[in-house]
Regions:
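Extended alpha-helical assembly domains of large eukaryotic scaffold proteins
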Residues: 1-299, 303-305, 313-315
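Repeated scaffold domains used in trafficking and secretory/extracellular systems
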Residues: 296-305, 335-350, 376-391, 396, ...
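Surface-exposed loop/turn elements that mediate protein-protein interactions on large endomembrane-trafficking
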Residues: 320-335, 359-378, 399-422, 442-468, ...
């Protein structure tokens, strides 16, 4: 090249040179050193050239340019190199080219970030784009999400009439939610609504319980009218009856609020009995929930975590981070892109992460002060899903670190170097941190006591002993003695393969759990004390299996058409979110579905 200017086409393939892997890695290292030297000299555009043209690290180059205020160049590169459209929209907003960002959002159906930004700056323009977003969702057949999007525009709710009717006609939990909204929007059609409502009340099928819960939760989000209050009285009594039969009922707080809204004085005297009814009916009962393809929201949710008082923080990729009330109303927005959230033990702070090529962009969130700020770009392979507010543990290649989460830069205050294998996963409590390593010899667990950071044990895992012809697919450990190992084996007298989970208590195999034959992939198992959740994907759905202790299956969640599911434990709840805009909060201690929202 005659100069170090970025070309705005796809990365050229270049000449075909047959280099040994070690030479190629050496060349890549030289380029990386050149980038670091140019950055230290303040030659930002030349450094970004090395990233984009030589290392072909397009996402990292865009993030680097944006961090140094080269917003237009970052946007042009993001668009030219075909980065995710949400990132392109974000970069054009940062560059001040709002209408170009909007056009890309419309063209590629990635509205959320554009709508949020416009509504903050110009309510009228934001409302117009929100309407376009709703229309786009309706055209795709996602009618319930279209209603949710346009519902924030009170003057345009009439546009939702046809979408509401189509959702009600289709049936399911989404139908029940839309029936509640129809009662608010068209009270003059009360007789027609009441007839449909009676079907929900008198339906004795097991799945009808969730339909009644969906209607109730939709009501809790609204300012109700007399017609809706009339329906609430029989609904609350039916929900109380449901609680006698199953743990799949409303949370007590939700039920109490429903009774207050219904103004049912007689029922209020019966409320003290409700908490006992909400407990699991038996230790072996398995909670099961199926969410239909049509029952989804408008947002792509990458991660979610429960906060105090029923609030929920959701990571929306390039669209930033939202904090929702227990009823799904947005009460805070942080303009920091995020695919994962690492939450502090007190749930008042979080670290957000999003991949940018070989690096990860980190930001710090303060939920109490409602502020967020970019922290740094860092390299890490694995990390603990929580931190104590001060120290965050991460793994990079064969090193394990404790990072000062409050430092200006990404600073390690403690390190275990060269652990004899790649750091595979990590987990912590306030008393210990464990990490799992993988080498040619197999898996090994390292256990350090906190806060002393004293090594208490180091053990090889015997997961593959007596595994015959099976292959280890993915695994994780817990802070206790339990571990979950997903294995793959060939079906006898067949060319097909199947997956199963081995659940261990230390080295003792407690249970083998076979997955359906159409299962094709998994998330890494998520663990907490004696609980573990495994997310398994088929072509049609994602299924979340929740286990307790030595393999007792206590809950199953079927998320139809979900392609990316996130799970997160805290002391009381399992939070599940997916790329269809669904959020579930499950109380695994009492076996109750606390929240079931769509965003």
């Amino acid at each position: 090249r005659n100069n170090l200017q970025i070309s705005f086409g796809q990365n050229p393939s270049g000449s075909s040179i047959n280099l040994e892997a070690e030479w190629f890695e050496h060349l890549r290292l030289l380029y990386r050193q050149s980038f670091e030297r140019l950055e230290s000299q303040g030659r930002i555009e030349e450094a970004s050239f090395v990233l984009a043209e030589l290392l072909q690290a397009n996402a990292e180059a865009v993030n680097f340019l944006s961090k140094h205020g080269k917003f237009r160049l970052a946007a042009e590169l993001a668009e030219a190199r075909n980065l995710p459209k949400e990132n392109v929209v974000r970069q054009w907003f940062l560059a001040g080219e709002k209408m170009r960002a909007v056009r890309i959002a419309i063209l590629h159906n990635c509205f959320e970030y554009a709508v949020t930004k416009l509504e903050q700056e110009n309510a009228e323009t934001g409302a117009e784009l929100r309407e376009v977003w709703a229309e786009s969702l309706a055209e795709s057949g996602n009618y319930s999400a279209a209603v949710d999007v346009i519902w924030k525009l009170e003057k345009r709710r009439d546009r939702a009439k046809d979408w509401i009717e189509k959702t009600i006609e289709f049936g399911g939990a989404a139908s029940a939610r839309m029936l509640a909204r129809k009662t608010i929007l068209y009270p003059e059609k009360f007789n027609e609504i009441k007839e449909k409502f009676q079907e929900i009340i008198h339906d004795d099928r097991f799945e009808a319980i969730e339909n009644r819960n969906a209607f109730a939760r939709a009501v809790l989000k609204q300012t109700i009218n007399d017609e809706l209050r009339t329906l609430l009285r029989p609904l609350t009594r039916k929900i109380l009856s449901d609680a006698l039969k199953t743990s799949q009922s409303l949370a007590l707080k939700e039920f109490r609020e429903l009774v207050v809204m219904a103004k049912d004085g007689a029922l209020r005297t019966d409320l003290p009995a409700f908490p006992q009814l909400a407990l699991p009916s038996g230790a072996t009962e398995c909670f099961e929930l199926v969410i239909a393809e049509s029952d989804k929201g408008a947002s792509v949710i990458y991660d979610a975590c429960s906060l105090p008082d029923g609030k929920i923080a959701v990571a929306l990729g390039e669209a930033g981070i939202k904090v929702l009330s227990r009823y799904g109303k947005t009460i805070a927005f942080f303009d920091q892109p995020a695919q994962k959230l690492v939450v502090s033990d007190f749930s008042n702070k979080a670290i957000s992460l999003i991949k940018r090529g070989e690096t990860v962009r980190l930001a710090r969130i303060d939920f109490v002060e409602r502020r967020a700020a970019f922290w740094c770009d860092a390299k890490l392979n694995v990390y603990t899903p929580n931190f104590d507010g001060n120290l965050w543990f991460i793994g990079l290649k064969d090193d394990f670190y404790a990072i000062d989460a409050n430092a200006k830069n990404f600073e390690a205050v403690w390190r275990v170097p060269e652990v004899g294998g790649e750091v595979y996963s990590a987990i912590r409590t306030n008393k210990q941190v464990k990490f799992l390593t993988l080498s040619a010899k197999g898996f090994e667990t390292w256990w350090y006591e906190l806060p002393t950071l004293i090594l208490r044990s180091r053990n090889e895992r015997k997961w593959l002993d007596n595994a015959a012809e099976s292959f280890l697919h993915i695994a994780n450990i817990s802070e206790g003695g339990h571990s979950v190992v997903i294995m793959q084996e060939q079906i006898q007298e067949s060319t097909d393969w199947r997956f199963y989970a081995n659940i261990f208590d230390y080295e003792h195999l407690c249970r083998r759990f076979d997955f359906p034959l159409d299962t094709v992939r998994f998330n890494r198992p998520d663990t907490f004390t004696q609980y573990a959740v495994v997310v398994a994907y088929s072509e049609q759905q994602a299924t979340d299996y929740l286990f307790f202790g030595s393999g007792n299956q206590i809950a199953t969640f079927h998320l139809v058409k979900a392609r990316n599911v996130s799970t997160k434990f805290n002391e009381n709840y399992l939070t599940i979110s997916d790329d269809c805009g669904r959020i579930l909060i499950y109380d695994f201690q009492n076996r109750i579905l606390q929240q079931n929202l769509r965003l």
